[in-house]
């Protein structure tokens, strides 16, 4: 049996990324320096939803190389209990949604999209009744 463990994104600013994902409600779990041949090559930062095993791994490469998101990436969805509260925390951190939250159908889920500091799109979903 397989199980889902993590998704990894490459980042350019660990402090900005940490502030963003903590404002989303993810908890910072650990930092893992990657050393090869005596040199610090990268640092991995792990985040997760409290009470869940799956993680988001953010990798910062210390050599300064840059990355292109490409055309194949769409988004990752994160469920939130209170979309308005999450949006307020993000706004306090200087992060605006791509557009105001909206419902897919009457009485259904509400959602909005935001981008992290590296341009990764995150869909925030508050499930409806």
Where are the model-predicted features located?
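Short amphipathic alpha-helices within nucleic acid-binding modules
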Residues: 20, 83-89
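Eukaryotic phosphotyrosine signaling hubs
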Residues: 4-6, 72-76
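Helix N-cap motif at beta-to-alpha junctions
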Residues: 13-14, 81-84
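Generic beta-structure capping elements
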Residues: 50, 58-61, 127
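Arg/Lys-rich, alpha-helical DNA-contact motif
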Residues: 51-56, 68
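Vicinal oxygen chelate
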Residues: 3, 31-34, 46, 78, ...
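Core segments of cupin and vicinal oxygen chelate
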Residues: 2, 8-53
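Exposed loop/turn and edge beta-strand positions of beta-sandwich/beta-sheet ligand-binding modules
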Residues: 41, 72, 108
């Amino acid at each position: 049996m397989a199980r889902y463990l993590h998704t990894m994104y490459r980042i350019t600013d660990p402090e900005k990324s940490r502030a963003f994902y903590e404002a989303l409600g993810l908890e910072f779990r650990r930092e893992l320096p990657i050393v090869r041949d005596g040199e610090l090559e990268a640092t991995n930062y792990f985040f997760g939803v409290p009470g869940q095993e799956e993680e988001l791994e953010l990798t910062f490469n210390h050599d300064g190389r840059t990355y292109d998101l490409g055309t194949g990436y769409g988004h990752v969805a994160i469920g939130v209990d209170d979309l308005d509260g999450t949006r307020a925390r993000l706004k306090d951190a200087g992060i605006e949604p791509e557009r105001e939250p909206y419902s897919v159908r009457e009485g259904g889920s509400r959602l909005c999209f935001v981008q992290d500091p590296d341009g990764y799109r995150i869909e925030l979903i508050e499930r409806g009744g």
